[in-house]
Amino acid sequence: MGGFVKTQKTNAYHKRFQVKFKRRRQGKTDYRARIRLTNQDKNKYNTPKYRFVVRFTNKDITAQIVYATIAGDIVMAAAYSHELPRYGLEVGLTNYAAAYCTGLLLARRVLKLRGLDQEYEGNIEATGEDYYVEPADERRPFRALLDVGLIRTTTGNRVFGALKGALDGGLDIPHSDKRFAGFKKDEKQLDSDIHRKYIYGGHVADYMRSMAEEEPEKFQAHFSEYLKKGIDADGMEALYKKVHAAIRADPTMAKSTKKEPATHKRYNLKKLTYEQRKASLVERLNALNSSAGADDDDEEEDDE
């Protein structure tokens, strides 16, 4: 009966050992998915595959249109949820409704960049129903592939809120409605009313109402920023409608104005030039000579 045989990590083993890619070792990139999102047909020359990349942090949502080159990925356009205060949404910048706004902003921005914003206006009124952009006579719609990275693609995930925003904005992204918020697995169809509620922040409004009734003190702390801005549960839908209209009116990225750096107090001596050092030396020598001459005069007076 054979027992456990320990692997002998010899010199030959270490010489032939091949490490995985760095971002695989760090657990940041799914290369199985990436190779399928970036590999293009060999008969399509200089035609990149565009990816609609969505990533989330604790306080921000990032949406980008990216394409791969040998030198590295190139970001063609980007939109962030921290831009939404410019359009009237100052709180709740990481929820499903904010993800929709970020996707919509990116779609309108990239279409304006390509000169397609007038031809493909998308779905102006968000109804919650699935939407596919129809090709126009002259130019085809801008096509991209959804890149979710390592996000778990559960039904109702915020990444699909960003996808819905990009679709309504006029981008052509292959998709299914099975992962949108409101899809019912038993009935195998999307409940557009539930999805519409999520797009306009209705789920947040419901939570505000229930918490205000059950735990008023916690409500004051949890929704303090909403209350400071004067946002209540009843005005949530109207707020998001204004934000969507403002995004469509001007999707361009605003240039940030940076302040001039403040002048800091110097605690170390400034380095002198050669001429300054030479002049300083002459001054010190003159001072020494004058002091030496004064001492000689004092000695002569004492002798007298």
Curated annotation (Swiss-Prot):
Record's GO cellular component terms: cytosolic large ribosomal subunit; nucleus
One annotated GO biological process: translation
A GO MF term: 5S rRNA binding
Pfam families in the record: Ribosomal_L18_c, Ribosomal_L5e
InterPro entries: Rbsml_uL18_euk, Ribosomal_uL18_C_euk
Entry similarity comment: Belongs to the universal ribosomal protein uL18 family.
Protein task: Component of the ribosome, a large ribonucleoprotein complex responsible for the synthesis of proteins in the cell. The small ribosomal subunit (SSU) binds messenger RNAs (mRNAs) and translates the encoded message by selecting cognate aminoacyl-transfer RNA (tRNA) molecules. The large subunit (LSU) contains the ribosomal catalytic site termed the peptidyl transferase center (PTC), which catalyzes the formation of peptide bonds, thereby polymerizing the amino acids delivered by tRNAs into a polypeptide chain.
HAMAP family xref list: Ribosomal_uL18_A
The protein's name in its UniProt record: Large ribosomal subunit protein uL18z
Primary gene name: RPL5A
